[in-house]
């Protein structure tokens, strides 16, 4: 009997403390855009307004929603897709045991109950990409939805997509996804990588990682599974994912040829693209820029080729002494992508894997090819973002952003960090967040998170949380630096709460309220400590903010400006010091 993945097998939590799910009505009937509303307490009887923030958690944090993973989540985009009249349902390819990396399907594999659904594709001669609509002056429902989430006009969204400066990854077979946008003129986004390996994890664990990552703020998910049950794992994830899902198709294609890179063929890869497009994958990482002539350049590197996809294609090219088939068949790939509106994430297969290799000839040679491929994709109205490094010291980061914008004509940049030093295994979420904040400020549109397990092992759900929060910090810091119009609102609210000793509001306004409260309560667990005018760092007598309050009260009582109060107060304290014998410690 086939098994199933149930909500009882994974940890699902309600909304974060002090928050509730709210919906903003869109311009069309039934369109409801989710937000998270953070309540605030009053200040001496004066109300503090609630703060609304971007929400990626999907229906899982809506108390009215009953989680039934075997049914998938709601499909708000389904009617929008059908009413445009340019898609058709068809039988689709047959799902085979080889898709899951086995010769015979296992009776113990939890098959998703609706795997026999009919996929959609563009009608003959039609193009269903958001870029195609945008270039034809059409503002889609997805664009209207995104405009509300970002606080901008729908026409601005349409223009950014039409010009290639932003992508709206939204496969027509992933109607569960809540539309979002990736572009440097919008909020900086964060991607979380999940996926099994040949030695670790189960389908239930990966579904849990997905719900966990989106709860903490992941804007997209990449399923990088390389073990068994790749197809089935992906089906469970997509049917329950409220955010876009990306993959690296070469991983599954390699499994289909028993892990032997030289046995890969265009036919196997093409079949894999169609398989994943029919499932609803929203963007593909495709390493079409790893050209045969670039591979010898990497021989003098400290760490060679560190990209899994890049090394697979390099091995194939060298064995056959032929050009990369992803490059030679790129136009055919575009034809597949535009039938389903799958976006390109052009892979940086030659990214530097060490500080010593940053900004070298191999890296920038590949970038030139990615610029060439971007033009080809845009000719087909297929959406494109560009993947970037990697390991780059701080003084070389800006050059990466400038070259990408120039060579790739402003297409969104999507970077892994970059890591700014190589000496901190176990802390690479920090070494990379430093670079991520910088490159986000310079213009990167999406940051791929790094967890503490980077270079060490497969991340678990706690590592996923740590990675997402760390990268939400970097992304928000970049938004602040870029002057995003709503970025300051939450900072200002938290600072006000901190100064007024509204401890619960401080916790609730933070990116990780549970962690903030946990750390506070380690030393001051009593409920009364939630209203105290100090914390355990300084205690009641040395709290700088309490002293600042005293100065303000002194000024108010003596009808003085704050500056005058400080000067007068200092004179009085100086006199008191002298009168008590000028002893430093009483």
Swiss-Prot record:
Give the originating organism. Bacillus cereus (strain AH187)
Q: Biased-composition ranges for Basic and acidic residues?
A: 22-39
Region Disordered, residue ranges: 1-59
Binding, Zn(2+): 391, 455
Q: Which cofactor does it need?
A: [4Fe-4S] cluster
Q: What does this protein do?
A: Catalyzes the synthesis of the hydroxymethylpyrimidine phosphate (HMP-P) moiety of thiamine from aminoimidazole ribotide (AIR) in a radical S-adenosyl-L-methionine (SAM)-dependent reaction.
Entry's cofactor comment: Binds 1 [4Fe-4S] cluster per subunit. The cluster is coordinated with 3 cysteines and an exchangeable S-adenosyl-L-methionine.
| Tagged with keyword Lyase | yes
What GO biological process terms are annotated to this protein in UniProt? thiamine biosynthetic process; thiamine diphosphate biosynthetic process
The cross-references to HAMAP family, in alphabetical order and at most eight, read: ThiC
User: Which protein, by its recorded name, is this?
Assistant: Phosphomethylpyrimidine synthase
Query: Could you tell me which NCBIfam families the record lists for this protein?
Result: PRK09284.1, PRK13352.1, thiC
Describe the reaction catalysed, as an equation: 5-amino-1-(5-phospho-beta-D-ribosyl)imidazole + S-adenosyl-L-methionine = 4-amino-2-methyl-5-(phosphooxymethyl)pyrimidine + CO + 5'-deoxyadenosine + formate + L-methionine + 3 H(+)
- PANTHER family according to UniProt: PHOSPHOMETHYLPYRIMIDINE SYNTHASE, CHLOROPLASTIC, THIAMINE BIOSYNTHESIS PROTEIN THIC
- A Gene Ontology MF term for this entry? carbon-carbon lyase activity
Q: Where does substrate bind?
A: 193, 222, 251, 287, 307-309, 348-351, 387, 414
- Kindly list the GO CC terms recorded for this protein: cytosol
Q: What class of enzyme is it?
A: lyase
Which EC numbers characterise this protein's activity in its record?
Answer: 4.1.99.17
Q: Which domain of life is it from?
A: Bacteria
Q: Which residues bind [4Fe-4S] cluster?
A: 535, 538, 543
